[in-house]
A protein has these predicted regions:
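N-terminal "arm"/small-domain region of PLP-dependent enzymes with the aminotransferase-like
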Residues: 1-48
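PLP-dependent aminotransferase class I/II
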Residues: 28-30, 227-280
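Short loop-beta-helix segment that forms the pyridoxal 5′-phosphate
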Residues: 50, 62-84
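Short acidic capping loops at alpha-helix termini that bridge into adjacent secondary structure
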Residues: 68-72, 93, 204, 226-227
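Conserved PLP-anchoring active-site segment centered on the Schiff-base-forming lysine
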Residues: 88-107, 121, 135
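Helix C-cap/helix->beta junction micro-motif
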Residues: 111, 195-196, 225
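Active-site phosphate-binding strand-loop segment of PLP-dependent enzymes
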Residues: 122-210
Length: 280
């Protein structure tokens, strides 16, 4: 029996004139992307295997974000990387915000991860109380989390018991509420996650819609945050949902290697790679 489709953007099960379920740029594909895709049809892009390492796209993204190419991993949309991360790390216990993006939970359930929810309260406008979230992590991790990914052998040896969270997902801006968390608060959360050995995933896929995305992104700080994994996508801002293109930034190359080991080799099509470069 097939699993019922739960993501937004399902314009196929029923006729839809205006789709409010998927937050995609209503302006559509950029003109430069359209022109690049037309060139791809004339060239043998669709007739050959794509570069499994997305080298040209990775270089373009590294230049765009001013980071080393070794920190970047491209995927078949951000969802591909979410599932890849779950299968690579196989966390035992996770903390998710609610409401938030559904596919975090789906990916974690696929690896039999226990999930707790940190509820965003309607009376507070669904705003995240970072202080309380940090306290929740600390209470759950009265001792070091010995099964966490990315923690040192010395940290692992400091504890024999673990009741804490292996992984935490933060969507910023949050989907579906649109509520944001300033980078100073995200960095505070990252500091707590480092202390509790909780791997932090920060989904920044909607940040390009903000007036000042630099006030929220923690990408410039990744060099010192080996336990943080940032998700980005071309899906929303460039209206490329049908092409499927996302990417992750992480300074922990061991984590990126583990993800590559559990994924198919050609997860990003040649068309998507060329479109991504054109979009940048």
């Amino acid at each position: 029996m097939h699993t019922k489709y739960q993501h937004g953007g399902d314009i196929y099960s029923n006729k839809v004139s205006i789709d409010y379920s998927a937050n995609i740029n209503p302006l559509g594909l950029p003109q430069g992307v359209k022109e690049e895709l037309a060139r791809c049809i004339e060239e043998p892009v669709c007739c050959v295997y794509p570069d499994s390492q997305c080298r040209d796209l990775v270089k373009a993204l590294a230049d765009y974000h001013k980071v080393t190419q070794d920190w970047i991993l491209c995927g078949d949309g951000a969802a591909d990387l979410i599932f890849g991360l779950a299968f690579a790390l196989k966390p035992k216990k996770a903390l998710l915000l609610a409401p938030s993006f559904l596919e975090y939970e789906q990916a974690l359930k696929a690896v039999d991860c226990d999930i707790d929810l940190f509820y965003l309260k309607e009376e507070n406008g669904y705003r995240l109380d970072v202080e309380e979230l940090c306290k929740t992590l600390e209470r759950a991790n009265a001792t070091y989390n010995t099964t966490a990914v990315g923690c040192s052998d010395q940290q692992k040896s400091t504890s024999e018991a673990n009741n804490g969270y292996n992984i935490l997902f933060l969507c910023n801006p949050n989907n579906p509420t649109g509520i944001t968390v300033k980078k100073e608060q995200v960095l505070k959360l990252a500091e707590t996650c480092e202390k509790t050995n909780t791997f932090l995933v920060v989904d920044e896929c909607f940040e390009e819609f903000l007036d000042e995305p630099e006030a929220y992104s923690i990408i410039p700080f990744l060099e010192k945050l080996s336990h943080v994994f940032v998700l980005k996508a071309f899906t929303k801002i460039y209206a490329m949902a049908g092409l499927r293109l996302g990417y992750a930034l992480c300074s922990n190359e061991d984590v990126l290697t583990k993800i590559c080991q559990v994924r198919q080799p050609w997860s990003v099509s040649g068309l998507a790679q060329r479109a991504g470069i054109a979009a940048l």
